[in-house]
Amino acid sequence: MDNVLHLIFGNHPKSGTIKSRAEVILRFLKVRVDWVALDDIEKEINISRQDNPSMFYKPLSALKKWRLVDSVRRATGKTRQGNNTYTTYYKWTPERFLVYLRDTLHAKCETELKMFK
């Protein structure tokens, strides 16, 4: 897990806290096989989305970018005014991460080799 997190977040001294939060999120999603609500993730890492949105969403954003987690937004109810309320769900997708890694690495190396000639 350390190599994957190092690949995603790098080795910047300030990335340590983000890596630890991302690791907690990944372990939680790996145990829960199906889609997990954002509220459950919030309880697991013990950081409020309203109080500290950047601390909460930075690890999720990076994990989504690298396709280690997938997200879907579903309508879960209606307000009194008749508007839909939505909940975001996340799921651990290691197979999509490997495909993303293979495709981007191949494209990057191919581009550099063409420039080298």
Regions found by a protein language model. Give the residues of each.
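Short alpha-helical segments that sit at the start of domains
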Residues: 1-28
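Alpha-helical recognition domains of nuclear gene-regulatory proteins
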Residues: 28, 44, 59-62
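Short, well-structured alpha-helical interface segments that form or flank functional binding sites
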Residues: 16-24, 36, 51-58
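Short amphipathic alpha-helical interaction segments
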Residues: 49-66, 71
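Short helix-to-turn junction characteristic of helix-turn-helix DNA-binding domains
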Residues: 29-33
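Short acidic, hydrophobic short linear motifs in intrinsically disordered regions
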Residues: 34-46
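Short, Lys/Arg-rich nucleic-acid/phosphate-binding segment
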Residues: 72-87
